[in-house]
Amino acid sequence: MEVSAILRGTRLSAQKGRLVADQIRGLRVEKALNILAFSPKKGAGIIKKVLESAIANAEHNEGADIDALKVKTIYVDQGSVLKRFTARAKGRGNRISKPTCHITVTVGD
């Protein structure tokens, strides 16, 4: 039994999200939640919410035992880039890229 939760278009770069995802891949969900709760990275809070959603999906939809669940797969894919401009000297402007990503978490026995 495998249950997924997906978050699309969150304002986090995929590279920074993968740093957090690599820390919890393959761990039991209780240990993964503990690691994410005490991580200072911005992506930790976002991935924690997605993991909690996947756990709730497994419990509600499949009737799974939470203590037996592991993080089967977790990956962070690159989303679209929001392009913004900031004013510079002499009437010029510079582009600012605001990257987004898609986070997918799958939990199972």
From Swiss-Prot:
Disulfide bonds: none
An individual GO BP term: translation
Organism lineage: Bacteria, Pseudomonadati, Pseudomonadota, Betaproteobacteria, Nitrosomonadales
Described purpose of this protein according to its UniProt entry: This protein binds specifically to 23S rRNA; its binding is stimulated by other ribosomal proteins, e.g. L4, L17, and L20. It is important during the early stages of 50S assembly. It makes multiple contacts with different domains of the 23S rRNA in the assembled 50S subunit and ribosome. The globular domain of the protein is located near the polypeptide exit tunnel on the outside of the subunit, while an extended beta-hairpin is found that lines the wall of the exit tunnel in the center of the 70S ribosome.
Subunit composition and interactions: Part of the 50S ribosomal subunit.
UniProt family annotation: Belongs to the universal ribosomal protein uL22 family.
Pfam families the UniProt entry points to: Ribosomal_L22
UniProt protein name: Large ribosomal subunit protein uL22
Cellular component, GO annotation: cytosolic large ribosomal subunit
InterPro entries documented for this protein: Ribosomal_uL22, Ribosomal_uL22_bac/chlpt-type, Ribosomal_uL22_bac/org-type, Ribosomal_uL22_CS, Ribosomal_uL22_sf
One GO molecular-function entry: rRNA binding
Keywords, sorted A to Z: Ribonucleoprotein, Ribosomal protein, RNA-binding, rRNA-binding
Domain of life: Bacteria
CDD domains reported for this sequence: Ribosomal_L22 (cd00336)
